[in-house]
Regions:
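Sec-dependent N-terminal signal peptides
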Residues: 2-23
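Signal peptide processing junction and immediate N-terminal pro/mature segment
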Residues: 19-34
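Acidic, glycine-rich catalytic/binding loops that coordinate metals and/or anionic ligands
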Residues: 63, 73, 82, 190-193, ...
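Active-site scaffold segments
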Residues: 143-145, 198, 215, 220-221, ...
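Solvent-exposed coil/turn segments that connect beta secondary-structure elements
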Residues: 148-150, 183-185, 225, 238-242
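Zn2+-dependent peptidoglycan hydrolase active-site motif and core
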Residues: 156, 160-206, 231-232, 236
Length: 272
């Protein structure tokens, strides 16, 4: 997708949006003091073993349910990076049971038909991945959602999610960025995922690592930081590798292939 085509698509979408975005900027974000087990807890989910969540000062094992998502298998792929180097990486493609149509999903911003202008393509061969001039864009492990600047971004609970999302980072990364951790039932176990909200105009007031976000809570506001004149939400999903302690990592390391695996967002986004 060229820059000109991207701009044309996003301009058409934004022009069709009539809902105002600025009125919600003053809305205070709900930062809950509860753990994923809905109880006050000094424990972080990261301190409990796989298959368990904190409840008070103890870890309680969660029994798998019949509604668990199937195990999403990581696959190896490769592409040429911006410098032309051949880079091998892991990625989790869309599961066959998940709809291919991006319009089948709910997003953290207002989205009707055709609002995804750039989708996930890291499962494709190198020459079929997104390209810009001079390889300025190499592959795309997310969805891009053009919006009016300042549009509120509302948290969505992921498919098979247990408890609320935990804020793990707020600051510069993909422009102004918020990273949240979500625990999902998957393959008869609990797996942790990251959601990356990129290019924000600003995070929600009071948002900080350690806070929790419920469905509908404001994460931040759409902008173009780190992506001048391309006002959009970059929404990326990553599965945290087992044994990785995010509290010991900086934001760049959190999204490194060694610590988390990029995932087609359609595997985890809620259906309409």
């Amino acid at each position: 997708v060229t820059r000109a085509a991207w701009l044309a698509s996003s301009a058409a979408l934004v022009a069709a949006m009539t809902a105002g975005a600025g009125s919600a900027r003053g809305r205070a974000v709900h930062v809950a003091a509860t753990s994923h087990a809905e109880a006050l807890s000094p424990l972080s989910p990261a301190l409990c073993p796989v298959g368990a969540l904190p409840d008070g000062d103890a870890c309680v094992r969660i029994q798998p349910g019949d509604d668990d998502a199937p195990e999403a298998e990581a696959e190896e792929n490769a592409h040429h990076d911006r410098r032309g180097r051949w880079i091998v990486y892991d990625q989790i493609p869309r599961r066959p049971d998940r709809p291919a149509d991006y319009d089948a999903y709910r997003y953290p911003v207002p989205c009707e038909h055709g609002c995804v202008v750039s989708g996930y393509d890291l499962d494709r061969p190198d020459d079929a991945q997104r390209r810009g001039r001079h390889l300025s864009h190499v592959g795309h492990g997310a969805v891009d959602l053009p919006q009016k600047k300042g549009t509120p971004i509302a948290m969505v609970a992921l498919e098979h999610q247990v408890g609320d999302a935990e804020v793990v980072y707020v600051g510069p990364l993909f422009g102004t960025t918020v990273l949240t951790r979500h625990t999902l039932r998957e393959g008869n176990q609990l797996r942790d995922y990251l959601l990356l909200f990129g290019h924000l105009d600003a995070p929600a007031t009071g948002l900080a690592p350690g806070g929790h976000l419920k469905e509908g809570d404001v994460v931040g506001f759409v902008g173009d930081t780190g992506s001048p004149e391309l006002v959009h939400l970059h929404l990326e999903a990553r599965r945290i590798r087992e044994g990785v302690d995010l509290t010991r990592l900086g934001p760049g390391a959190m999204i490194d292939n060694e610590n988390s695996v990029v995932c087609d967002p359609r595997n985890v986004l809620p259906l309409r």
